[in-house]
Amino acid sequence: MSSGRIVQIIGAVIDVEFPRDAVPKVYDALVISEGNLTLEVQQQLGDGVVRTIALGSSEGLRRGLSVTNTNEPIKVPVGTQTLGRIMDVLGNPIDEAGPIGEQERMQIHRAAPAYEELAASEELLETGIKVIDLVCPFAKGGKVGLFGGAGVGKTVNMMELINNIAKEHSGLSVFAGVGERTREGNDFYHEMKDSNVVDKVAMVYGQMNEPPGNRLRVALTGLTMAEKFRDEGRDVLLFVDNIYRYTLAGTEVSALLGRMPSAVGYQPTLAEEMGVLQERITSTKIGSITSVQAVYVPADDLTDPSPATTFAHLDSTVVLSRDIAAKGIYPAIDPLDSTSRQLDPMVIGNEHYLVARGVQSVLQRYKELKDIIAILGMDELSEEDKLTVNRARKIERFLSQPFHVAEVFTGSPGKYVPLKETIRGFKGLLAGDYDHLPEQAFYMVGGIDEAIEKAGKLK
């Protein structure tokens, strides 16, 4: 193992000089024994100097300190010993429950599986959330993005999906907290603990208060753990909250390394960095990774380069809308903006497809009529349009649902609605079977039978 010395420190960027015949490779991990800090090589500047990013705080460092090259990229613990544990970007335990005791460590930088190893999936993954199962169904082994601005419910939706899928699906899960609030990480841990599924979840956190190097690499740490489970032939769920913070950490690192920014100040390597991560989140013939990723949308602009780059990699996109949240309809998922590759009669069957498209066409017609209603009022509409508006308003409310994870705040018990029930309810609404019920009966209920029961109480 060769050793060098620090020659320059600028925040999280540290330049280290090595003998010219022992210059570290890009992505090699270097260790500063004093302060126990790990650095990752990003650039070779020539004359034996390498530019590195600190995976931890660089406070207290000084020029001339000795640095040792480990001659390999960062390695993190993998395997069943990681389950039920909380780790940082380097795989060190941060839950005060002793060492991980892993039998194997794997490099966080790996190639994506070869094309011939990949496996397509047609199997649907039922979530129990009406609007998702109906309009943007998830595929087992697929990639899902939850897009939304600040405060429209990305994390709550993700928590509900974890609650519904991780409990129903008896497989293993990996949760990567990338640049999100420490409180949310804490909430998630206790949520898992209370529901007795914590021993099936590995948690990796690089939260908001950490240096950019940690936030940039923590997604890869979580992914490496998920890949190990997949390569053992298991079906694993990977939750990433939040992909935007991964991009943002890349922007910070890119600026610190002195690269020219591209559009909106993002790093010039945005598409490549996203591709490196997303291409590894995939299912092979041995096992599957089903991933759910929250994507923050800056200023509610879906054309921003970061969310726009993420779109290309996903099978299902769930778009959360501020307008729907403002109406008090939760989950605030936009059924017209959200899409899925699975919404195909060959995959989901003809009945489901026709009901989903029927719901979308009624809501689209209502959207078009809103301007006329605002100017002239409901009375000027034709009888057919009046009927469409009334049905659309009922459908809108029926797309809402009480969540298990929000029980503490709402006081109403959460509901898991099976797909068959969802299709039956919306099919009846489109056919006009429930035109006589008041629209308030459809708000915040589970299945259609509950809506009928609620209507009886309202009378």
Curated annotation (Swiss-Prot):
User: Which terms in the GO cellular component ontology are assigned?
Assistant: plasma membrane; proton-transporting ATP synthase complex
The protein's matches in CDD domains, at most eight in alphabetical order, are given as: ATP-synt_F1_beta_C (cd18110), ATP-synt_F1_beta_N (cd18115), F1-ATPase_beta_CD (cd01133)
Which amino acids does the record list as binding ATP?
G148, G149, A150, G151, V152, G153, K154, T155
What enzyme category does the UniProt record give?
A: translocase
Task: Could you list this entry's UniProt keywords, alphabetically sorted.
Answer: ATP synthesis, ATP-binding, Cell inner membrane, Cell membrane, CF(1), Hydrogen ion transport, Ion transport, Membrane, Nucleotide-binding, Translocase, Transport
Compartment list: Cell inner membrane
InterPro entries, A to Z = AAA+_ATPase (IPR003593), ATP-synt_VA_C (IPR055190), ATP_synth_F1_bsu (IPR005722), ATPase_a/bsu_AS (IPR020003), ATPase_alpha/beta_chains (IPR050053), ATPase_F1/V1/A1_a/bsu_N (IPR004100), ATPase_F1/V1/A1_a/bsu_N_sf (IPR036121), ATPase_F1/V1/A1_a/bsu_nucl-bd (IPR000194)
What is the membrane topology noted in the UniProt record heading this document? Answer: Peripheral membrane protein
The EC number of this protein is 7.1.2.2
An MF annotation (GO) of this entry = ATP hydrolysis activity
Reactions listed under catalytic activity: ATP + H2O + 4 H(+)(in) = ADP + phosphate + 5 H(+)(out)
Please give the subunit comment from the record.
F-type ATPases have 2 components, CF(1) - the catalytic core - and CF(0) - the membrane proton channel. CF(1) has five subunits: alpha(3), beta(3), gamma(1), delta(1), epsilon(1). CF(0) has three main subunits: a(1), b(2) and c(9-12). The alpha and beta chains form an alternating ring which encloses part of the gamma chain. CF(1) is attached to CF(0) by a central stalk formed by the gamma and epsilon chains, while a peripheral stalk is formed by the delta and b chains.
Q: Which PANTHER family match?
A: ATP SYNTHASE, ATP SYNTHASE SUBUNIT BETA, MITOCHONDRIAL
What family is this protein classified in?
A: Belongs to the ATPase alpha/beta chains family.
Purpose of the protein: Produces ATP from ADP in the presence of a proton gradient across the membrane. The catalytic sites are hosted primarily by the beta subunits.
* Record-given protein name: ATP synthase subunit beta
